[in-house]
């Protein structure tokens, strides 16, 4: 793992992490890991199997059946007991449950080995909340995204409009503020920038400028 370049992208919700991660992956040809999908996998399994409480034995059973498989498009498929469950993970119920599961320290710890197994040649873009602080502290380049609440709410609003929803901007702002509070102040792996992370405020920067900046930082880190 030490010889494979890793770039971590952490930061606030709707700050641009996912967009820039995909662009970096396409530009560099690196695999891309969205760590949130692993918590969604646990959430989906909990819902489907009617699990009430995560005991040590149940967590071990799930981990034994859970695999993450690299795809040709540089993403990963989530396999559980030989079934591809990836397409089932992106609904509201699963997302809400995943938010609760992400606070479980036992689950976060057992997922470390799965996330480490995602390190593949020629490199990995790791997108999440604690990629640079806990999962890949040895990463060659760590980026932390931030942006104003107004800008992030507007971005989320526009995303929902494009998807056919009828969102309320004020409600989105409230939701983001609540999520920030939970992410930053939670006891297990709170959201924060790694000490050696480059902090990028994406409020006033366009995506091309940000991409060029990170690519430049990557080239410097390779020297």
Feature locations, PLM:
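Small-molecule kinase domains that catalyze NTP-dependent phosphoryl transfer to phosphate-bearing small molecules
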Residues: 70-71, 108, 115-121, 128-138, ...
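Glycine-rich phosphate-binding loops of nucleotide-dependent enzymes
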Residues: 142-151, 156-159, 164, 192, ...
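ATP-dependent NMP and nucleoside kinases share a basic, alpha-helical "lid"
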Residues: 86-163
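Hydrophobic anchor at the beta1->P-loop junction of P-loop NTPases
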Residues: 7-9
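Walker A/P-loop
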Residues: 18
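ATP-binding Walker
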Residues: 14-15
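N-terminal phosphate/diphosphate-binding loop that engages ATP/GTP or pyrophosphate donors
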Residues: 26-92
């Amino acid at each position: 793992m030490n010889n494979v370049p890793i770039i971590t992208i952490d930061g606030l919700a709707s700050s641009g992490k996912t967009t820039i991660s995909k662009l970096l992956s396409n530009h560099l040809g690196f695999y891309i890991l969205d760590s949130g999908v692993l918590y969604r996998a646990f959430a989906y399994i909990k819902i489907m199997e009617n699990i009430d409480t995560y005991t040590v034995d149940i967590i071990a059973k799930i981990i034994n059946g859970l695999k993450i498989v690299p795809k040709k498009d540089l993403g990963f498929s989530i396999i559980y007991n030989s079934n591809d469950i990836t397409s089932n993970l992106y609904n509201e119920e699963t997302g809400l449950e995943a938010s609760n599961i992400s606070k479980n320290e036992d689950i976060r710890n057992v997922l470390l080995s799965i996330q480490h197994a995602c390190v593949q040649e020629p490199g990995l873009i790791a997108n999440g909340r604690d990629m640079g602080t806990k999962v890949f502290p040895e990463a060659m380049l760590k980026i932390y995204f931030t942006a104003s609440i107004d800008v992030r709410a507007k971005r989320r609003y526009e995303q929902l409009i494009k998807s056919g929803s009828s969102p309320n901007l004020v409600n989105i702002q409230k939701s983001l503020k609540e999520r920030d509070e939970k992410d930053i102040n939670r006891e297990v792996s709170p959201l924060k920038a790694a000490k050696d992370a480059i902090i990028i405020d994406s409020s006033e920067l366009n995506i091309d400028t940000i991409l060029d900046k990170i690519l430049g930082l990557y080239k410097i880190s390779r020297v």
